[in-house]
Structures are given as C-alpha cells and as structure tokens.
Amino acid sequence: MVKVYYNGDIKENVLAGKTVAVIGYGSQGHAHALNLKESGVDVIVGVRQGKSFTQAQEDGHKVFSVKEAAAQAEIIMVLLPDEQQQKVYEAEIKDELTAGKSLVFAHGFNVHFHQIVPPADVDVFLVAPKGPGHLVRRTYEQGAGVPALFAIYQDVTGEARDKALAYAKGIGGARAGVLETTFKEETETDLFGEQAVLCGGLSALVKAGFETLTEAGYQPELAYFECLHELKLIVDLMYEEGLAGMRYSISDTAQWGDFVSGPRVVDAKVKESMKEVLKDIQNGTFAKEWIVENQVNRPRFNAINASENEHQIEVVGRKLREMMPFVKQGKKKEAVVSVAQN
C-alpha cells in the first residue's frame, strides 16, 4: 500500500534560506509561486517578457529572465509546457546548474525520455499536484490542498527527498496527502490516462456516440445533449463518489444499461487496444513521434486539429452553448484564477 505523507510527516525549515525559482508563469507556475510565497518560501519567477512577466510582477513576485532566475536559485522548478522544456533548458538553465542545486519538474516526460539529461552533481526530483493550477491555488487559499505526487530521480545531496516533500507542503499538497512514485511510473501512467481515457478515449467515445445517433436519423442537437453535454453530470458524480456513487445517483434504468451495454462498447478488443497504447508509451514510440512532430512544426497535429474543430459535433455545440450562458459563466470564473500559458 502506498504511503501518504501529510504536513506532520515533513521536516520543518528544509527550504529556509533557499531560493526557489519557478520557471514559467502559466496556470501551474502562478499557483506554485503564490502558494510557496505565502508559505514563507523565498520565491523568484523566471519567465520571458510578455503578459506572464507583467502578471508575475503585478502579483508581487521578483521576476527575472529564465537564465537569471536559474542562476540565483538553489531550487529550480520547471513549469513550462513539455515541448518547450528541452530548448529552454539547454539555452538558459543547464549552464546555471552548479553542484548541489535541485532541478525539479511537475511531469517526468523530458527526463524519462532523455530529452533533458541533468548533470550528475545536482538533485533531480518531481512534485506533481493532481489538479489544474487554479484548483491548486483556490484550495490553498481555502486552507486545504490538492493531493500531489513526488519522485526522486537523483539524490546527490542526500536531501532530495526532504526537499521534495517540503516543496509539496509549500504548495499545499501535504494538507491533502503526498504519494511517492517514480519518474517512470508518473510519466507512463499520466500519458496513458490522457490518451486512452481522459482525452483520447473519451473524445473518441463521445464522437462515435454522436455519429451513431445522427447517422441513424436523430437530430444532431439531441445527439449532442445525450452524448456530450450531459457527460459533465456523470463525471461530476464519479469525481465525487466513484463509480458506485455515480450508479447510486442515476436511475435504475440507466444503471442496468450501464451493466449490460457498457461492456459491449468497451469490450476485450478495446482493452487490447489500450494495451497497445500503453506499449507505445512504455517503449518510447509515442514520445519519439511527438518530439519529431514538434521538430517539423506540427503538420499532422495542425491538420488533425483543424479537421476536428469543424466536426459536426463542434458546429452544433457552438450553437447550443449560446443557449446556455451558465456554461460560459463557469468558464469566465475559472479564467479569473488562471493566466496565459508561456
């Protein structure tokens, strides 16, 4: 059984006298920097000139270029998008990593797939809140927190574990619980969840359901409501109470349909396909394809994205959402606590 660490399990004053540089001031960077600062940690922000630079200044941070921040800090947390990290690391962080410093990530992709190869004389660890930045920030302000993962890749100083847990505590994670993992496990499970279930699998399921109804002659508007719009109602129940709690809250008719029809849709063949997706993640096939795609300016990515954006479900959805101002109000509220990604 995994061990869960809470505030009382974590050494005090581990980060005292140390400067933490948060590199990037998007959704996660914004939350990490503010939470750490309010936890008494000496925080600086490293970000390029632009909206995020200005926002970080307005939020009261000491803001520098990435290179300047990396030079000043003992602990460097990289919170840039995966596809930007390697380039920024090579140009602005690598040469500032003197012996004994700590290089930190919130996702293991670039280290696990060797896009970033840290020097042998620095600590390398991961602290990953299991929620978006606006939630990390909001729960912290409420006196709570979002559960987090931590992992150690290199422990040169003998203090990497203590620093990782102290960082997790500083952003509020230890109020909810911090779980230990590895860079390999965090990276591979995160990618699998995104591809097979949360994003890829779910998007394909919703679209297939919509197409099945419209191709059978049903109105696209009704297909949208039944296959996409009402999804939030079910996911919220699952999020709060798990699968059993969701089933308790729906009608018996819906629950019986769940039991007898769900396995017909997601059958053994689908599970075998999931295993193939996982295999491509584990052996590096997916990572190689994504890295190359970015190196050639994303031709497939952009073409697929443009096509998907014009699918009938999007056309119908845009019209129907105009009928539901409460949907947009929720989006605007979330945007208030987030800032533009770098």
Curated annotation (Swiss-Prot):
Domain of life: Bacteria
GO cellular component terms, A-Z: cytosol
Protein residues bound to Mg(2+) 1: 190, 194
Catalytic residues, chain numbering: 107
Cofactor: how bound: Binds 2 magnesium ions per subunit.
Top-rank EC class of the record's enzyme: oxidoreductase
Reactions catalysed: (2R)-2,3-dihydroxy-3-methylbutanoate + NADP(+) = (2S)-2-acetolactate + NADPH + H(+); (2R,3R)-2,3-dihydroxy-3-methylpentanoate + NADP(+) = (S)-2-ethyl-2-hydroxy-3-oxobutanoate + NADPH + H(+)
Cofactor: Mg(2+)
GO molecular function: ketol-acid reductoisomerase activity; magnesium ion binding; NADP binding
SS bond list: none
Sites where the protein binds Mg(2+) 2: 190, 226, 230
Domain KARI C-terminal knotted, residue spans: 182-327
BP-aspect Gene Ontology terms: isoleucine biosynthetic process; L-valine biosynthetic process
Pathway: Amino-acid biosynthesis; L-isoleucine biosynthesis; L-isoleucine from 2-oxobutanoate: step 2/4; Amino-acid biosynthesis; L-valine biosynthesis; L-valine from pyruvate: step 2/4
Residues that bind NADP(+): 25-28, 48, 52, 82-85, 133
Keyword set, alphabetical order: Amino-acid biosynthesis, Branched-chain amino acid biosynthesis, Magnesium, Metal-binding, NADP, Oxidoreductase
InterPro entries linked to this entry: 6-PGluconate_DH-like_C_sf, KARI, KARI_C, KARI_N, KARI_prok, NAD(P)-bd_dom_sf
UniProt binding sites for substrate: 251
PROSITE patterns assigned to the protein according to its UniProt record, in alphabetical order: KARI_C (PS51851), KARI_N (PS51850)
Residue stretches making up the KARI N-terminal Rossmann domain: 2-181
EC assignment: 1.1.1.86
Function statement: Involved in the biosynthesis of branched-chain amino acids (BCAA). Catalyzes an alkyl-migration followed by a ketol-acid reduction of (S)-2-acetolactate (S2AL) to yield (R)-2,3-dihydroxy-isovalerate. In the isomerase reaction, S2AL is rearranged via a Mg-dependent methyl migration to produce 3-hydroxy-3-methyl-2-ketobutyrate (HMKB). In the reductase reaction, this 2-ketoacid undergoes a metal-dependent reduction by NADPH to yield (R)-2,3-dihydroxy-isovalerate.
Stated family: Belongs to the ketol-acid reductoisomerase family.
NCBIfam families (UniProt xref): ilvC, PRK05479.1, PRK13403.1
Protein name (Swiss-Prot/TrEMBL): Ketol-acid reductoisomerase (NADP(+))
Organism listed in the record: Bacillus subtilis (strain 168)
Higher taxonomy: Bacteria, Bacillati, Bacillota, Bacilli, Bacillales
